[in-house]
Amino acid sequence: MIRRRVIVHGYVQGVFFRDSVRRLALRYDVNGWVTNRWDGTVEAVLEGESEAVERVVAFCREGPRGAQVESVDVSAEEPEGLSGFSVG
């Protein structure tokens, strides 16, 4: 199991970014959360099997239709055993 914290910069709010991440995370059995931040970025914490988490991270680099991802910061963290996936 791995954990990644992802910060997505660009035009990423108001384009169903969070819901798209949630749906993909549920499809790949990835736990965690995603939220809009005050500075216009989207932040996500993802936990699960390596391949599944990396698929969601790869999606974050592209985003849904309508998003314009400028950059993505990804950091590795120790898994905490999160359960479920929430949108904030």
Residue ranges and their predicted role:
Residues M1-G88:
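Intrinsically disordered, low-complexity, mixed-charge
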